[in-house]
Amino acid sequence: MLSMVLPFMVSAATPEGAEIELQTNVIDLGVLSQEDDKQIVRLSYSNTGDLPLVVTEVATSCSCTTVKHSREKLMPGERGSMTIAMDPAKAPEGMFYRVLKVYSTARSGVKHITLKAEIKN
């Protein structure tokens, strides 16, 4: 009976697929004025899985934040990056929190990045 259970346990512990690991999942831009220039952040990520990874979309929740990213395949072990731009002039005054959703072919599903700042007039 043990020989039937052991192969199942081994295969369950090593699923195949792409996996995305973000450099960070929180970006703190600090205190900004609505008159400040766009804030540009480059965020790196890597494919820690064993199949190719493609970032298919990075969704933002407001017009003050944009993201540019590559849609090229990342082989296992390779790194990529995305450029996140936030325009304080388009952000409301006060504490600013936005969640970016990273959609990819990773087996773990959608990853979230929190962008935060304090916006002053």
Each PLM stretch: what is its role?
Residues 1-8:
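Bacterial N-terminal signal peptides
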Residues 50-79:
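Surface-exposed binding patches on compact interaction domains or structured appendages
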Residues 41-47, 84, 98-103, 115:
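Buried hydrophobic-core signal for structured, non-transmembrane domains
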Residues 12-48, 119-121:
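Beta-sheet-dominated interaction scaffolds and their linkers
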Residues 48-51, 90, 106:
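Short, acidic/polar linear motifs in exposed loop/turn regions
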Residues 35-42, 89-99:
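Short, solvent-exposed loop/turn segments enriched in Ser/Thr/Gly
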Residues 27, 78-84:
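Short strand-edge motifs at loop-to-beta-strand transitions and within beta-strands
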Residues 92-121:
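Terminal connector regions
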